[in-house]
């Protein structure tokens, strides 16, 4: 069965504030909590649905992903935006664009009934600047990122050599404690051991009891051709390590494309401003323009006006999800000559005089504009 819209579940508008979302969730949680409806499967499902909606909409990144892509943007099992067609990159650099916005850092789940909580490692993020050419053609590079590794002194236990972690006396190794609040009996993470089920009487001096130390590691990054500004590449398992056997987090490389001196990108299309002499605009001719693949030329017809746009098909960028390249839009700007010689001025005056004899035949836009101005004042 298709999932309901999260905003609909909580009964709030899409532009609802964080406080409005929280209040709506609390109201539903009180109404459908299993302790208040012990024999109602329907109430249990409503409670789970509200809890899931709140978890997504109360997290800024997840909410942004959901607003843009819907359930596919926050559910890794649904193959969200950009998740298809990139198996070839997975071997070199994880699952490209799989679950683009990732999960909340340090998510917890119980490792087993009665056992300590298992924590997923936190995600890491790395910002990288590349050129438009690198984005268009693809780019292989290396990055150096900080990484947490197991402490070699205590071998990851966090305890001073010769000692070992002991069972937490507060939760008796469960990782959680149960507290009663009014109608509810709430299970929460043990405040002493933070869900590990153990505590360390004598911490390792090298890692200060964390069981891990930070080092810098080098990763190969394969940036696919057609990547756009703001997109992220996910390197699975290269985030921080998990706790109590939990899976490691992921590394997200966020791509930023430097401004280009000639082109502006719009999706798979490119735009450029091309100055042309007024003689070419009047008489027509062939002009040459740069493209990301080299030079290209196209004819300019007689009487071309400044601001005219020419479309060169297939001279843009081949996008990630496209089998064909976008287009290049050339916006011509007719240049007016400056610093004329006396001879050039005389020639232009003769030319201007000859134009007056032709009237609107030579300047149709000017004639149309003056006609509109005249009717405006009448």
UniProtKB/Swiss-Prot annotation:
Record note on cofactor: Binds 2 Zn(2+) ions per monomer.
InterPro entries (UniProt xref): DnaJ, DnaJ_C, DnaJ_domain, DnaJ_domain_CS, HSP40/DnaJ_pept-bd, HSP_DnaJ_Cys-rich_dom, HSP_DnaJ_Cys-rich_dom_sf, J_dom_sf
SMART domains listed in its UniProt record: DnaJ
Domain J: 5-70
Zn finger residue spans: CR-type: 138-216
Keyword vocabulary terms for this entry: Chaperone, Cytoplasm, DNA replication, Metal-binding, Repeat, Stress response, Zinc, Zinc-finger
Main location: cytoplasm
BP terms from Gene Ontology: chaperone cofactor-dependent protein refolding; DNA replication; protein refolding; response to heat
Cited NCBIfam families: DnaJ_bact, PRK10767.1
PANTHER family (UniProt xref): CHAPERONE PROTEIN DNAJ (PTHR43096:SF48), DNAJ HOMOLOG 1, MITOCHONDRIAL-RELATED (PTHR43096)
Subunit structure: Homodimer.
Protein name from the UniProt record: Chaperone protein DnaJ
């Amino acid at each position: 069965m298709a999932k309901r819209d999260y905003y609909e579940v909580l009964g709030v508008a899409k532009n609802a504030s964080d406080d409005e979302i929280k209040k709506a969730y609390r109201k539903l949680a009180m109404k459908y909590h299993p302790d208040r409806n012990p024999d109602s499967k329907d109430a249990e499902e409503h409670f789970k649905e509200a809890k899931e909606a709140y978890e997504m909409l109360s997290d800024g990144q997840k909410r942004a992903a959901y607003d843009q892509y819907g359930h596919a943007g926050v559910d890794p099992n649904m193959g969200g935006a950009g998740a298809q067609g990139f198996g070839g990159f997975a071997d070199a650099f994880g699952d490209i664009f799989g679950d683009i916005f990732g999960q909340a850092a340090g998510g917890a789940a119980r490792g087993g009934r009665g056992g300590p909580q298992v924590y997923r490692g936190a995600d890491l993020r790395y910002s990288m600047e590349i050129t438009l050419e690198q984005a268009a053609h693809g780019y292989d590079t290396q990055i150096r990122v900080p990484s947490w590794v197991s402490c070699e002194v205590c071998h990851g236990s966090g305890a001073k050599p010769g000692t070992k972690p002991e069972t937490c006396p507060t939760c008796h190794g469960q990782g959680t404690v149960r507290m009663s609040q009014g109608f509810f009996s709430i299970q929460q993470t043990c405040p002493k051991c933070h869900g590990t089920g153990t505590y360390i009487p004598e911490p390792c001096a090298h890692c200060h009891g964390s069981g891990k130390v930070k080092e810098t590691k080098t990763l190969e990054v394969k940036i696919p051709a057609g990547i756009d500004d703001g997109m992220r590449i996910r390197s699975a398992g290269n985030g921080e390590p998990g706790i109590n056997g939990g899976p490691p987090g992921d590394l997200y490389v966020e791509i930023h494309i430097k401004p280009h001196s000639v082109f502006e990108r719009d999706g798979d299309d490119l735009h450029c401003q091309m100055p042309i002499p007024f003689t070419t605009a009047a008489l027509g001719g062939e002009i040459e323009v740069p493209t990301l693949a080299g030079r290209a030329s196209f004819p300019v017809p007689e009487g071309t006006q400044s601001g005219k746009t020419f479309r060169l098909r297939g001279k843009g960028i081949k996008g990630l999800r496209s089998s064909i390249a976008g287009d290049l839009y050339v916006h011509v700007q007719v240049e007016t000559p400056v610093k004329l010689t006396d001879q050039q001025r005389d020639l232009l005056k003769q030319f201007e005089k000859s134009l007056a004899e032709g009237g609107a035949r030579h300047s149709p836009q000017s004639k149309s504009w003056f006609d509109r101005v005249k009717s405006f004042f009448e």
